Structures are given as structure tokens and as C-alpha cells.
Amino acid sequence: LYGPESLLALYGNVVPFICSNTRQYPDIFLQRAAALTLCKFMCISAEYCEANLGLLLHLLRTSKDAVVRANAVIGLGDVAVCFGTLVDENSERLYAGLGDKDLGVKKNTLMVLTHLILNGMIKVKGQLGELAKCLEDEEMRVSDLAKLFFSELAAKENAVYNNLPDIISHLSTGEHAVDETTFMNTMRFIFTFIDKERQAENVIEKLCQRFRLTTQERSWRDIAFCLSLLPYRSERSIKKLVDALPFYRDKLYVPDVFQCFSEILGKMHQGKSSSAAAKPSDTDLREFEDVLAHAASQSKQDHALEDATQTQTAKLERRHARPLVSKGQPSRPARTTRQTRRRVT
């Protein structure tokens, strides 16, 4: 592309110019051909790729033609095979295709990301939450592809476990959060891959610590729901949950949170009746049951007292805000006026 006698060099500058000037070259087929040619040229020259990667990403984000966007995604996948470092540095912009309104663009993006991630061509940097959204996509083909991706990813040691905190945060809070029903359905599938007892114990500890970092009831419900999806087969799991009681004690007045912990208690009883080697003891179960009931009762009382205090404080503030003017007492300006009139008379 840069040799003095190279035939392709004649088109090296023409192709980006056409892609960048859609008003001057509005023909849709010309734009599609130029975008494809740009992708192919980028695969044969690192210098050309680095110079025009920004343009290709711009086409993926702003092109009004879904065919151009879909081809740009595939082209980025091919470029990643040739020059993985360049694409890896801009991988977060590739994930944007998962939110495209066009089914073809979304499906191509999901397939390209699946190929690149599973083959280690790009690193996952906290963006698995966007892929997890596809598990509940309305289009069955997208949903099935997402399930296949996570099933293959789970075959890699600790891959899903290591990214679980980021997935939960991405789907539960912030601008990327999904509704609670979608969150629950997604987590039910994701947590099927957390099947090792050691992993479950660590997740229990990490999730419980999140209770103290948020003041939103939605987040409390999401955390409690995730805790209810974990297996509780050993004494260590119960101990982790009991030791973390100070983190969630004051949240148990929320019905959904308490319900999730009640389901956890039911799982513990099931674990006791199973033939697991490290099953929880009767003492552990009674201790957790008593602690849970007492904490829930205390939390309800504290919450009721807090509401009553806030109500009383609001009444006092409104009372002090009223003007203190006696009935029938004239204002100072009026009294001054009458005095002035008497003097004149």
C-alpha cells in the first residue's frame, strides 16, 4: 500500500476519502464497496490499519446504512486477527454494536466478540455485562448465541467467576442497568456456572460487603437475590453469611430482601438432608435462623422508629417556619403612619 510501484497504493487514499465524504459520494453501493475495501486494506498493512482504524470505528458508530455497520464489525474481527493489539486497545467501542437496533449488526457483533474473546485475541475488560444483556434479548438467535458464548467461556477456568462482580454491577446500577425481571433471569443463568464451593464462599463474602456500599433498595434486592442463587453446602458458607450480618442486618425490613434470606435458609436445610461431605450442622442452622429472625424484627423496629422520627422532625420544621404575628396587631409601617398624622394635626 505504500510501495512506489504498488498497484494498491493508487487506491490507498481514495478509499478513506470516499468513506469520509458520504455527502459528496452518496451512492449506497459505492459506500458499501468502499467500507469493505477499507477493511481489506487494513488487514494487509499495520501502518494503514493504525491510520484508518478510527475511521472504521466511526463508520460502525455513525453510518446510517446497516449493511456498512455490519460489514464494519466483521472487518474489525478480521483486523483483530492480524493486528490484535490495535483492536484490543479500542475493544470497548466494538461492544457498542451489541446495542445496535439492526438485528444483523447486533448478531455480527456478538459472533465476532465470541470468536475474539474465546480465542484470546482481545481481553475482557469489564464489558461482559453487555454480552450478558443479550441472554434476555427478544430475538431468539441472539439469546441462543449469548448462551453458547457463556457456556464456552465457563469451560475456561474461573473465567465467569472472575468477571461476576463486574457483570452484577453493570446490570444492577448505573446507566446500563436493566429492569429487575431481566436482571433475575440473567443471573439465574450466569450463576449456574458458579458450582465450586470455594468460589461460592468467596462470592458470598464479596456480595455481602456490597450491602454497606449502597443506599438503594434496588441494589439491596439484587444483591440478596444473587446470594439466594448460590449453593450452601458447607459450614464455611453459613459462617461467611453469619459473619457478614452487620452488613445487611438493617436491610432485612425490605420484604424481598428478607424473602431471599429465607430461601437461603431453606437451601441450608436441604443441604443438611443431602449426603454432602461437609454439610452444615443443626447448631449452625439454628444459629442462623435465630439470628435472621432477630435481625429482621430489630430492623423493622429501627425502620419504624426512623420513619416516626423523620415525621416528627418535619412537623417541627413546618411549625417553626410559620410567621409569629399576633391577631389584631398592626404592622409597624401602619403605626408609624398614624403617629405622623397626629403630629401634623
What are these regions (language model features)?
Residues L1-F17, G129-L135, R141-T345:
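Long internal repeat-built scaffold domains in very large eukaryotic proteins
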Residues L1-M121, K196:
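Alpha-solenoid helical repeat scaffolds
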Residues A80, V87-S91, Y95-D166, L171-S172:
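Polyanion-binding and phosphate-handling cores
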